[in-house]
A protein has these predicted regions:
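RNase H-like nuclease fold core
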Residues: 1-52, 59-63
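RNase H catalytic domain
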Residues: 11-14, 55-137
Length: 138
């Protein structure tokens, strides 16, 4: 089983509030704020919010597939090159904020459950499209 999934986050510097959303192809888009106990006021900035979105996306897929996760390949698409640099190890762990390092560790634990997990950065992001317009493998 293969999952193509998209996630994005926004962060308001003035109010310090974040909006996080993700979409798993073939499922209805989810609003993380309604589904998670995480305080969205706790994000440090937009980069941290993007990492939280990746974490919640992985947790949602794990909840959805349960024990079948070992048979699943996951492709996560985000517009955050900051998350990609940390994910790929381009940034040394000593240079990563402790909050992001904790998220990376949690994401790696989720990744161990799947057959494979790949993170792709999609630049030129222009916001969410309707699910029927989103390119997904069937």
């Amino acid at each position: 089983m293969r999952f193509n999934a998209f996630c994005d986050a926004s962060f308001d510097r003035r109010t310090k509030l974040s909006g996080l959303a993700y979409h798993i192809c073939g499922r209805v888009p989810s609003d993380v704020q309604e589904k998670s106990p995480v305080s969205m006021a706790g994000c440090l900035d937009g980069n941290h919010a993007e990492f939280v979105a990746v974490y919640w996306l992985l947790s949602e897929i794990v909840d959805y597939v349960g024990e079948s996760a070992a048979l699943c390949d996951v492709v996560i698409k985000t517009d955050s090159d900051h998350v990609e640099r940390i994910w790929q190890g381009v940034v040394q762990e000593r240079d990563v904020r402790k909050e992001e390092l904790a998220l990376l560790t949690a994401c790696r634990q989720f990744c161990e459950r799947f057959s494979s997990v790949n993170l792709e950065v999609v630049k030129g992001h222009v916001g969410w499209r309707q699910p029927e317009q989103t390119s997904c493998d069937k």
